[in-house]
């Protein structure tokens, strides 16, 4: 169902894994250098591509957005003084999620070979993750995308568009005289009586003749135009060649349309000769055009964005997790897949979806693992209203109903607190955590904190794993007794507040004074 993030690094592997370039290939310029990070590295042009090609605006797409999220995470790790080994471990771990072993191996090879280059780019372009993703071929150039769409639109219709010749002829038409009349050959000067119109007609006539008789004329014209780009200097030269590479096909199409038309009519269209009458470039036939009404309907439909409630997000996650459990996925893989689902939802609910996973994710997985009816999970989590009784009996969880709320609190603590948090920080979080959970479970949260606060503080200082902490407390699991091992302090307030000695033993004197002895 949702496998796009798992294929992200696979796309990266396929995009960067290009054949080794020979020196003659590198001599072809930026068009070859900037195809991928591998080609740029082989041609020693990483900095050039980073500054002049990959920094251009990119098209929004799912692979591009996911890549930018991944690069942002790595950037934050670098900002927090994360080591290269930590980042390598993180990326290689993501490579292991790829379903295809070949792509997984290729992904790891790319990480091993180009990680220093990628890290340097992330440090330099921390606020522009799209630059790194363009280098990895996961973000597409907006300029190329628009040019391709424009060309594709023309190819899908045989309608002759109204072309702006003043825009399309430069710089190709500007180089036609140089190609037809080389400067090293002396030419007779035009007579003073010859006007611009006659010059245009002669030029168009020569171009038409060259197109008809010389099969290589068009290609040589494009090559000559690229050579002329070198006259513009280092900064503009590459941009000029890039422009020619993108728009040369369109210019060639224009020339092919010109070859069967009257030169005077063409010169009249571009304003060099007086217009006698309106003459089309060629005989028009019915065009394959989509009706405007139909196009408006489609555009309006795509703008509308579905809104999602917490209940709908929960039901979506239950359906996803149920399918993953049937596929024997590990809990780590399931959580990863749940995060992928958030990226496939509208942007307006992406953060809400992530918060849902942080608070309810582990509890949802545990309930489904314990054979809870999927239709009842969201109702039991108080995310959906109980409109109708479940069709199948629900397996009621033991331990007084504190298991789910315990896991929510521990998951929240794990998210908000740093590693090695002090007991003071943990106590401060427990005092306010109930205000951040859904109102439907706030009373149960307060009861839980009042009863288990001291031992929860001790366990969270040891480990912030929801399953470990809540099982250790005895509120989760199938144990008949809430006691695990011989530690009497996990028995709860009934033991802590028995007397001052037991309260001191379990570090619960303040708790007993506030809630029991007063």
Swiss-Prot record:
This is Prosaposin. Residues 18-60, 144-193, 277-306, 388-398, 480-518 form a propeptide. This precursor is proteolytically processed to 4 small peptides, which are similar to each other and are sphingolipid hydrolase activator proteins. Disulfide bonds join 64-139, 67-133, 95-107, 197-273, 200-267, 229-240, 311-384, 314-378, 342-353, 403-476, 406-470, 434-445. Residues 19-59, 482-518 form the Saposin A-type domain. The lineage of its organism: Eukaryota, Metazoa, Chordata, Craniata, Vertebrata. GO terms for cellular component: extracellular space; lysosome; membrane. One of its GO terms (biological process) is adenylate cyclase-inhibiting G protein-coupled receptor signaling pathway. Its main location: other. The keyword Amino-acid biosynthesis does not apply.
């Amino acid at each position: 169902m949702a496998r796009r993030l798992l294929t992200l690094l696979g796309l990266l592997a396929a995009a960067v894994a290009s054949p080794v370039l020979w020196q003659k290939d590198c001599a072809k310029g930026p068009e070859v250098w900037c195809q991928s990070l591998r080609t740029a590295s082989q041609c020693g042009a990483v900095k050039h591509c980073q500054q002049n090609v990959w920094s251009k605006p990119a098209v929004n797409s799912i692979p591009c957005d996911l890549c930018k999220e991944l690069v942002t995470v790595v950037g934050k790790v670098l900002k927090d003084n994360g080591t290269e080994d930590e980042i390598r471990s993180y990326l290689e771990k993501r490579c292991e999620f790829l379903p295809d072993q070949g792509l997984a191996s290729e992904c790891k090879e790319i990480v091993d070979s180009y990680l220093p280059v990628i890290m340097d780019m992330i440090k330099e372009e921390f606020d522009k993750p799209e630059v790194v993703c363009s280098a990895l071929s996961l973000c597409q150039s907006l300029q190329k995308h628009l040019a391709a769409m424009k060309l594709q639109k023309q190819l899908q219709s045989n309608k002759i568009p109204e072309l702006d010749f003043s825009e399309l002829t430069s710089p190709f038409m500007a180089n036609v005289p140089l190609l037809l009349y080389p400067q090293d050959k002396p030419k007779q000067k035009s007579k003073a009586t010859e006007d611009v119109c006659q010059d245009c007609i002669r030029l168009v006539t020569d171009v038409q003749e060259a197109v008809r008789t010389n099969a290589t004329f068009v290609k040589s014209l494009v090559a000559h135009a690229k050579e002329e780009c070198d006259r513009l200097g280092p900064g503009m030269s590459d941009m000029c060649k890039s422009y020619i590479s993108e728009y040369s096909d369109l210019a060639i199409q224009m020339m092919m349309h010109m070859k069967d038309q009257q030169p005077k009519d063409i010169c009249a269209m571009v304003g060099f000769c007086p217009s006698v009458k309106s003459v089309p470039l060629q005989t028009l036939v019915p065009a394959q055009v989509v009706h405007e009404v139909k196009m408006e309907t489609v555009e309006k439909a795509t703008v509308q964005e579905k809104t999602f409630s917490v209940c709908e997000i929960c039901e979506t996650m239950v359906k996803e997790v149920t399918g993953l459990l049937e596929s024997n996925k590990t809990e780590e893989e399931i959580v990863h897949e749940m995060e992928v689902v958030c990226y496939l939802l509208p942007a307006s609910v992406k953060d809400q979806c992530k918060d849902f996973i942080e608070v309810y994710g582990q509890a949802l997985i545990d309930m489904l693992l314990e054979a809870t009816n999927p239709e009842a999970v969201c109702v039991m989590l108080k995310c959906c209203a109980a409109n109708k009784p479940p069709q199948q009996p629900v397996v009621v969880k033991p331990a007084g109903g504190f298991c789910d709320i315990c896991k929510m609190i521990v998951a929240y603590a794990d998210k908000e607190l740093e590693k090695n948090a002090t007991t003071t920080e943990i106590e401060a979080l427990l005092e306010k955590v109930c205000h951040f959970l859904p109102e439907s479970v706030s009373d149960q949260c307060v009861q839980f904190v009042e009863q288990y606060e001291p031992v929860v503080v001790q366990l969270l200082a040891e480990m912030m794993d929801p399953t470990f902490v809540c099982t250790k407390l005895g509120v989760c699991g199938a144990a008949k007794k809430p006691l695990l091992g011989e530690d009497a302090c996990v028995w709860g307030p009934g033991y802590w507040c028995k007397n001052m000695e037991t309260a001191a033993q379990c570090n619960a004197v303040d708790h007993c004074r506030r809630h029991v002895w007063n």
